């Protein structure tokens, strides 16, 4: 592999405070390191936004958040906003060509998930 593909993980949250810490920790433990996480909260009323703010503050070059606006637009529209933002801002993250991975707030990712998925994507592109 000449250069490591640039991965943007898109995470939409809504009242997920009981899942979010474990989810974010599973992302930060990935064996593949050339990725960032972009989060959009969909108007949570629990501690989700506080958790996001804490993780963004502690992981400034790895985790980013769209501004909290308290609007609840649903997961599909939220992921669309995240995709649009990732495409428009990829250069500001130092990325040129990106692969996007969607992530639910209650998923726990295995340590090699990104590494294996990138390998499979690159193999498929070769065929």
PLM regions with names:
Residues 1-127:
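Nucleotide-sugar donor-binding/catalytic module of glycosyltransferases
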């Amino acid at each position: 592999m000449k250069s490591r593909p640039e991965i943007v993980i898109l995470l939409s949250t809504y009242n997920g405070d009981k899942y979010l810490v474990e989810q974010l920790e599973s992302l930060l433990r990935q064996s593949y390191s050339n990725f960032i996480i972009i989060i959009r909260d969909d108007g949570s009323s629990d501690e989700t936004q506080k958790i996001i703010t804490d993780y963004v503050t502690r992981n400034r070059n790895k985790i980013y958040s769209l501004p909290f606006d308290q609007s609840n637009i649903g997961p599909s529209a939220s992921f669309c906003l995240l995709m649009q933002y990732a495409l428009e801002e990829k250069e500001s993250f130092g990325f040129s060509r990106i692969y996007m991975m969607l992530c639910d707030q209650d998923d726990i990712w295995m340590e090699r998930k990104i590494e294996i998925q990138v390998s499979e994507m690159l193999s498929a592109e070769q065929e």
